[in-house]
Amino acid sequence: APQAKFLSKRVEWIMCNMKNNWHIDPEELAKFCSENKSEPKILILNSPNNPTGTTHNRLEDLASIAKDYNLIVISDEIYAELDFSGTYKSLSHYYPQGTIISGGISKWCGAGGWRLGTMVFPEELNDLRTAIRSVSSETFTSVSAPIQYAAINAYNTSHDRYLWASRESLAIISEFIFEELSSVGIECIKPEGGFYILCDFSKVINKSSSIRTSKDLCKKMLAELNFANLPGSDFGLPDDDLITRMAFVDFDGSAVLKRFSNDKKFEKEEIPMFFPKIYEGIKKLVKWAKEQS
């Protein structure tokens, strides 16, 4: 959005809601395209999604609309390897001629901040690829050598077992969080991939002079619980919606991967041992939420 605004291009949010699992409604997309036929359009689709943790389940319908209105789609698949189902889902399966796939190593490798990635263009968009390559060469020439060497290993070696363990562990801790928060009336959708969950506190928090926005809520949780999350307003949601995004990544990845090196079933009783900070934080949050009602 900032880049588009810099070029004086209009940015339109196609709003989603919890009732439809935070998915883009194909009918809403079609309505917008129909009302703005004269403008060239780019659809940015992120799945598995940040901040919701959900995966889009109507890709074929979205692809049909994209084809009808000749959209260029940027399919942000940075979390694709962390889809808990282990199945690769992409809009490019249904609309390859107009879909640009973006990805990288920072998420599935657990290498936050190590920004090395790829963009895959179809032949039909070769001219656009050439233009972007030219702009990129004038913006950044390369990434640092350590990241390049890490990427060589990441892309040249099979990581099936590692990815399986990553998906399993994230699915387990996300289910624990979902069940705990839901038990006290905090509304959320069970994550399907990645490591985020979007939570609606509106039914457990009485809006007061100190909590009127999602930013107020996050500040209060940080001050009283040392619990950090981001306000929904950072992701385009209305300021007065008491919605926050949580990330469930504060654990010892090496220990968890070692635990999953054997095929013994992971039991819920093991969560405090392998995810102690998340376990303690969620338990404190649940207790705090009860006190606010």
Each predicted region: which residue ranges?
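Substrate-binding/gating loop at the entrance of the active-site cleft, primarily
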Residues: 1-11, 18
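Helix C-cap/helix->beta junction micro-motif
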Residues: 7, 36, 68-69, 184, ...
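Active-site phosphate-binding strand-loop segment of PLP-dependent enzymes
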Residues: 16-86
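PLP-dependent enzyme catalytic core of the Aspartate aminotransferase-like
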Residues: 34, 210-211, 220-229, 235-293
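Conserved core segment of the aminotransferase class I/II
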Residues: 97-171, 175-181, 265-268, 282-283
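Conserved glycine-rich beta-strand-loop-beta hairpin in the small C-terminal domain of fold type I
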Residues: 168-178, 188-204, 240-242
